[in-house]
């Protein structure tokens, strides 16, 4: 009898073990869909991005016009651009939900998988930031100026770093060229990191909502979860297409329709909505170096999650106090996002400072405390 090709061919065997015959816990819920949705987002962004790059010119004099040309004169250029811009928003929605799921169900205890995931998040944030600069509108220019200037807070080498990032003494043509090169390159790095992330995940197998070992109850990925993922794709792509076709500029900033002008500073510089929580934390500290450290810590704190797990139960499924704390953290992040979009004035300053303090308190102090307390309560 001939051997089954998908099980014997060296390349097909890898695909088979990752996507077809992969043993998967039978009880994983829809929260486990976001990994495949992120893969879909990445593929969509790379394809639309390549098509946009064919018509884009990374030069300060014509960058803005080349984007307008793509939307007006290229076949379906408007649709490709709208899908790419709004696809980034969906990418971040999916990654935040994916991280939230990992946090709620204790997936961070697969330490290598979790750490590569955090590196993926940081790379995605860098990619989105350099991408936002490319249309060379007012917000693009001033966003680039403000965020790259943060490096100047680093003692001793700060100013040198900033000038190196700018490629000169201000944000200008070398900056735009460099950012375009990075924006083209980083998605492929993300794709490579994704493969590492998946390889490490398949070493341990997926976690599940109960947080218990599920080796005795696993089913093949295909057809059960491939079908479930297909439904997830449809559920995600429908609102993405709706947004791109009916209200493409809903999540953007109107000021980015004005070409970049170094002589006119916008009254309120703010990043895209998915960075607002971190921006609010940055602004909540009056000192520049302190703000930069808090901004960095707001994301890097995720690396500490495995060490701050003090409960004997893996997931929060049966831990009501931790659940309350988790949803308080979610509400707190929404407050930070809202505050980040507001001008720097009373009462937003104090709200931002309180929300930033709460964010770090919940993650670094309350979660370990409550985890240990719940374990103690179980023993009584």
From Swiss-Prot:
Cited Pfam families: Cytochrom_B_C, Cytochrome_B
Binding residues annotated for heme b b566, in chain numbering: 98, 197
Keywords: Electron transport, Heme, Iron, Membrane, Metal-binding, Mitochondrion, Mitochondrion inner membrane, Respiratory chain, Transmembrane, Transmembrane helix, Transport, Ubiquinone
GO molecular function per UniProt: metal ion binding; ubiquinol-cytochrome-c reductase activity
Cofactor: heme b
Binding site for a ubiquinone: 202
Cofactor binding, note field: Binds 2 heme b groups non-covalently.
Sites where the protein binds heme b b562: 84, 183
InterPro entries in the record: Cyt_b/b6_C (IPR005798), Cyt_b/b6_C_sf (IPR036150), Cyt_b/b6_N (IPR005797), Cytb/b6-like_sf (IPR027387), Cytochrome_b (IPR030689), Cytochrome_b_C_euk/bac (IPR048260), Cytochrome_b_N_euk/bac (IPR048259), Di-haem_cyt_TM (IPR016174)
Localization: Mitochondrion inner membrane
Summary of subunit composition and partner proteins: The cytochrome bc1 complex contains 11 subunits: 3 respiratory subunits (MT-CYB, CYC1 and UQCRFS1), 2 core proteins (UQCRC1 and UQCRC2) and 6 low-molecular weight proteins (UQCRH/QCR6, UQCRB/QCR7, UQCRQ/QCR8, UQCR10/QCR9, UQCR11/QCR10 and a cleavage product of UQCRFS1). This cytochrome bc1 complex then forms a dimer.
Misc. remarks from the entry: Heme 1 (or BL or b562) is low-potential and absorbs at about 562 nm, and heme 2 (or BH or b566) is high-potential and absorbs at about 566 nm.
Summary of the function given for this chain in its UniProt record: Component of the ubiquinol-cytochrome c reductase complex (complex III or cytochrome b-c1 complex) that is part of the mitochondrial respiratory chain. The b-c1 complex mediates electron transfer from ubiquinol to cytochrome c. Contributes to the generation of a proton gradient across the mitochondrial membrane that is then used for ATP synthesis.
Family: Belongs to the cytochrome b family.
Full protein name: Cytochrome b
Native organism: Aerodramus vulcanorum
